[in-house]
Regions:
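Single conserved hydrophobic/aromatic residue that forms the stacking wall/gate
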Residues: 1-12
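Active-site entrance/lid segments in N-terminal catalytic domains of soluble metabolic enzymes
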Residues: 13-18, 22-210
């Protein structure tokens, strides 16, 4: 089964599905190469994986994809630097697929210095205390500028001990945020000549019914 993602040339194909467990092996095709799933994705919070040379990352670890963090990249080195370099791939020299998370977890972790509401999240930088606002639309614009192959939708990450009522309310807001992310994603174009895809995030805390 091959699924072509809306608004993108990227596609996902099932290579194998286990009939007993529904476990799947898949193949994601991007403009920067293919990703065999399930996959170990090294985390490069600021665009690079710490303690690992780029050559080792590609030739020894054989990383097919790495993750960058939208919140941290937005604050440092900043969007102007990344855009001037021609996107995150040019900035860090990694020519294989990349994914950026939405910054939702980082905003959640700033519980003492952020305000969360329907419009989005207002928070203060952990670096200098400056005030910033992340909305679904703003996050889409930021991820377009960063330029990863896979962009994650903006979501609220609830604490693991959240009560059911709050988890449900949060999940429903995450769904509304996803609708706004999709609208903004479809209103904008990639900046660097290759396709990007928008992936949603499943929320619901520890409650299977959600």
């Amino acid at each position: 089964i091959t699924t072509r993602l809306v608004g993108s040339e990227m596609c996902i194909r099932d290579r194998y599905t286990d009939s007993k467990t529904n476990a799947r092996a898949g193949l994601i095709t991007t403009d920067h190469g293919q990703i065999e799933t399930p996959i170990f994705m090294p985390v490069g919070t600021l665009g690079t994986v710490k303690g690992v040379h780029l050559t080792e990352l590609k030739e020894d670890i054989k990383a097919q994809i790495i993750l960058g963090n939208t919140y941290h990249l937005y604050l440092r080195p900043g969007l102007d630097v990344i855009e001037k370099a021609g996107g995150l791939h040019k900035f860090n020299g990694f020519d294989r697929p990349m994914l950026t998370d939405s910054g939702g977890f980082q905003v959640f972790s700033l519980a003492g210095i952020r305000k969360l509401r329907e419009e989005g999240a207002e928070f203060r930088s952990h670096i200098d205390g400056s005030k910033h606002i992340f909305t679904p639309e703003r996050v889409m614009d930021i991820e377009r500028t960063i330029g990863a192959d896979i962009m994650m939708a903006f979501d609220e990450c609830t604490p693991g001990d959240a009560e059911y009522a709050y988890a449900k309310k949060s999940m429903e807001m995450t769904h509304r945020w996803l609708d706004r992310c999709i609208t903004r994603f479809n209103e904008t174009e990639p900046k660097y000549g290759y396709h990007q895809a928008l992936f949603p995030i499943v929320q619901g805390c520890v409650y299977p019914c959600l």
